[in-house]
Amino acid sequence: MTSQQREKELLPVRVPIFKGLYGWRLLVTTQNKLNSFSSMNSLSDFKQVHFIQGHDWPDTQILLDSGLPVVTSIEYSSLFNMLIKGRGDVFPRSLLEVEMELNTFKDDAGENLTVVPHLMLQYPTAIYFFFSKDNPEIAQAVEKGLAIMRNNGEFDRLFNAYYRSAIEHADIKNKIIIRLENKNLPLLTPLDNTSLWFSEKDM
């Protein structure tokens, strides 16, 4: 995931290869806490909800900057166990990750893990190809190749082949989207080029 520090150290090709989908977050919780989310529909409703995140993930700072309580662990494998054991209330997961993760942790949780059906978070973020600043010619070659793929439709064809099912399964059109600011997003992020990003209009 891009950040101001990462773009200082490395050379990014600013084409978000997942079209920003890692910033579209479904809310994983437990069955016994699901009802507590039923009346929530705005950011202010989450001020007493404890979000589970990785200790040094960029997402953690995004939540903190939005005034949301966060509990963390340095071990990815322990994050779902924290949720199952009630050490946090909700674990936001990318819509690209959530189905696989729920299946992976089903044996530990039984049927206890679920997704809040009417809410999701969204914040701008990008995953790029990064290269050493000592090798700009490689970055230029990749940038040129991606431009060709975008112009001839191959980029979108591959994107839809791999990710359309997850997008549809997320049922975005029937969710309230809580939008957060990403204060660590570099100024050169091409947010104005809407063709690079997924949006609800693509449903």
Language-model region placement:
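Periplasmic-binding protein-like
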Residues: 20-26, 107-143, 165-189, 197-200
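Bilobed "Venus flytrap"/periplasmic-binding protein-like clamshell domains
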Residues: 27-67, 79, 96
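Acidic, polar ligand-binding/catalytic clefts
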Residues: 1-45
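Hydrophobic residues within well-ordered alpha-helices
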Residues: 63, 83-84, 129, 142
